[in-house]
Design a protein with these regions (language model features):
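Intrinsic low-complexity/disordered segments
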Residues: 1-2, 11-13
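Conserved N-terminal beta1-alpha1 strand-loop-helix module at the mouth
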Residues: 2, 21-133
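Short hydrophobic alpha-helical segments enriched in small aliphatic residues
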Residues: 5-6, 15-19
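Short, linear, compositionally biased motifs with a strong N-terminal bias
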Residues: 13-16, 24
C-alpha cells in the first residue's frame, strides 16, 4: 500500500502554535504601496503601474510632504480599489482626525514614536484602519 502526501493537506505552521489554512489552498498576494507622491502625474503613474495603495506624507519636515488639502486633492484621482494612505510622524490626534476626514477611505500610517494608545486615540479607537511602521 502506498501512502500519498498532498500539499493540499499540509498545514502551514503558525507562530502561535496552531495551523493556518492548508498551503495549496491559500493564495498569497503582495500588496504594493507607493509613498511620498506629490504630483498628479506621479499618482497616475503609480495607479497605472498597479499600486494597491498610494501614500501621502503629512510631515512638514519631509521633502515629500504635502498638506492635508493637497493629499485630499491627489487622493481624488485614485480609482475605487487603490487605497490612500496618510503618513504621520508624531502628530496630534486632533490633526490626524481632521486630515483623515478630508480623504475618503484613507488608512493612517504612524511613522514616529506613537504608542498603541496614541494610534487608537487618533483613529477613533480603531474605527479608521491604521498601520504602525
Amino acid at each position: 500500500m502506498t501512502t500519498h502526501h498532498s500539499a493540499e493537506t499540509a498545514s502551514t505552521p503558525h507562530p502561535h502554535g496552531f495551523a493556518t489554512k492548508p498551503r495549496a489552498m491559500t493564495s498569497e498576494r503582495t500588496r504594493i504601496k507607493i509613498c511620498g507622491l506629490t504630483r498628479e502625474q506621479d499618482v497616475d503613474a503609480a495607479v497605472a503601474a498597479g499600486a494597491d495603495a498610494v501614500g501621502f506624507v503629512l510631515y512638514a519636515p519631509s521633502p515629500r510632504a504635502v498638506t492635508p488639502e493637497r493629499a485630499a486633492q491627489l487622493a481624488r484621482r485614485l480609482p475605487p480599489f487603490v487605497t490612500p494612505v496618510l503618513l504621520f510622524v508624531n502628530e496630534s490626534a486632533t490633526n490626524i482626525a481632521a486630515a483623515s476626514a478630508m480623504v475618503a477611505g484613507a488608512i493612517v500610517q504612524f511613522h514616529g514614536d506613537e504608542t498603541p494608545a496614541d494610534c487608537l486615540l487618533a483613529t477613533g479607537h480603531g474605527l479608521r484602519p491604521f498601520l504602525r511602521a
